[in-house]
A protein has these predicted regions:
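Active-site neighborhoods of divalent-metal-dependent phosphate/nucleic-acid chemistry enzymes
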Residues: 3, 82-122
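Histidine- and aromatic-rich ligand-binding microenvironments
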Residues: 17-18, 49-50, 104-105, 127-128, ...
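Acidic, PIN/NYN-like endoribonuclease modules and their adjacent C-terminal/linker elements
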Residues: 1-14, 112-113, 117-141
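Short, well-structured N-terminal submotif of metal-dependent ribonuclease cores
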Residues: 1-49, 64-71
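Short, well-structured alpha-helical segments
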Residues: 73-77, 92-93
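Residues that scaffold the ATP/ADP-binding catalytic core of kinase and kinase-like folds
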Residues: 24-26, 60, 133
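A generic structural signal for short hydrophobic patches within well-formed alpha-helices
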Residues: 22, 54, 130-131
Length: 141
């Protein structure tokens, strides 16, 4: 099994991003890792930002860095706008919009956006906050 290696420029790679790389880039903390993360994000041909990583980034920005909801959404939109980032962009942007404007937790906002983008008809949940978004039906189990 291959071990870790220091990555420089290798065009044509497809690489999954971990939360810590995105957070270092967005926060500048700590400075040396932030510089490396920013350089890495700028030089890769295709970097995949998984939905779960974006969700964890939101959690870290809010809980560790105490970034407010609008600031968190803005930072994540900036990450999604990077030309090297590949993601379910439309779905995630809609989830961020719901998270920010309708004030749902990101997991519920993501579920609402997923319903809107698929042929799924409703969400089974006890969370009444979902009712703030009129585009989906919540079913109480």
């Amino acid at each position: 099994m291959a071990g870790p290696r220091q990555e420089t420029e290798r065009a044509g790679l497809t690489v999954l991003l971990d939360t810590n790389v995105v957070i270092r880039h967005l926060t500048g903390d700590p400075p040396e890792m932030a510089r490396r993360a920013t350089r890495f994000l700028a030089t890769k041909a295709e970097l995949v930002l998984a939905d779960v990583v974006l969700a964890e980034c939101i959690y870290v920005l809010q809980s560790v860095y105490e970034v407010d909801r609008p600031g968190t959404a803005e930072l994540m939109r900036a990450a999604l706008a990077m030309p090297t980032i590949t993601a379910e962009t439309d779905l995630l942007l809609r989830a961020l919009e719901i998270y920010e404007l309708d004030r749902l937790d990101f997991a519920e906002a993501y579920l609402v956006a997923a319903v809107e983008f698929t042929d799924v008809e409703s969400i089974a949940s006890f969370d009444k906050a979902i009712d703030r978004v009129s585009s989906v039906e919540r079913i109480v189990p």
